[in-house]
């Protein structure tokens, strides 16, 4: 949601600051953990994915007025979540497993550890966030949109 609310630059920067401050030791990651070992641990890839997802969602909200509607945002958030957050997350989780256990987990084992348990909750959160997008994003174009000519009929009375 940071990319949706803050836009492409500030949204991405907010997530970068979140990761940097957490890596500096502020315990606000999962299980109230912090420090550089978190970035080098099993969840480090997911944290880096947060930055990528904020940049992508912020770009589309800033540059494409139609992306601010529920259905396009639902698709974008699904891509950001399962592509930009989970792919680096699963890669780092696999490398972390290799480092700590000496074996690289197979693809299915990796999905069972780092993706499948979270799908139901993620779908619920993505749906809620996409629904909120329509309410919190500008209803009028503000000049930077590529598809500004499609803004007619956008404003809800």
Swiss-Prot record:
Keyword terms of this UniProt record: Cell membrane, Membrane, Transmembrane, Transmembrane helix, Transport
Gene Ontology CC: plasma membrane
Major localization listed first in the record, in broad terms: membrane
Compartments it resides in: Cell membrane
Entries under InterPro entries matching the protein: BioY
Membrane-spanning intervals of the chain: 10-30, 38-58, 76-96, 104-124
Molecular-function annotations in GO: biotin transmembrane transporter activity
Membrane topology: Multi-pass membrane protein
Record family assignment: Belongs to the BioY family.
Role played: Probable biotin transporter.
Protein's recorded name: Probable biotin transporter BioY
Species for this entry: Methanothermobacter thermautotrophicus (strain ATCC 29096 / DSM 1053 / JCM 10044 / NBRC 100330 / Delta H)
Lineage summary: Archaea, Methanobacteriati, Methanobacteriota, Methanomada group, Methanobacteria
């Amino acid at each position: 949601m940071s990319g949706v609310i803050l836009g492409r630059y500030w949204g991405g920067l907010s997530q970068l600051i979140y990761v940097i401050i957490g890596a500096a030791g502020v315990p606000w990651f999962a299980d109230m953990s912090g420090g550089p070992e978190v970035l080098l641990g099993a969840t480090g890839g997911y944290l880096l994915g947060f930055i990528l997802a904020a940049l992508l969602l912020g770009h589309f909200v800033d540059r494409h007025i139609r992306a601010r509607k529920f259905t396009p945002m639902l698709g974008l958030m699904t891509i950001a979540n399962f592509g930009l957050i989970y792919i680096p997350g699963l890669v780092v989780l696999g490398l972390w497993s290799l480092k700590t256990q000496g074996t690289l987990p197979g693809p299915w084992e990796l999905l069972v550890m780092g993706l499948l348990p979270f799908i139901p909750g993620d779908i619920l959160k993505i749906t809620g966030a996409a629904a909120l997008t329509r309410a919190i994003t500008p209803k009028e174009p503000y000049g930077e949109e590529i598809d500004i000519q499609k803004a007619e009929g956008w404003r809800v009375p």
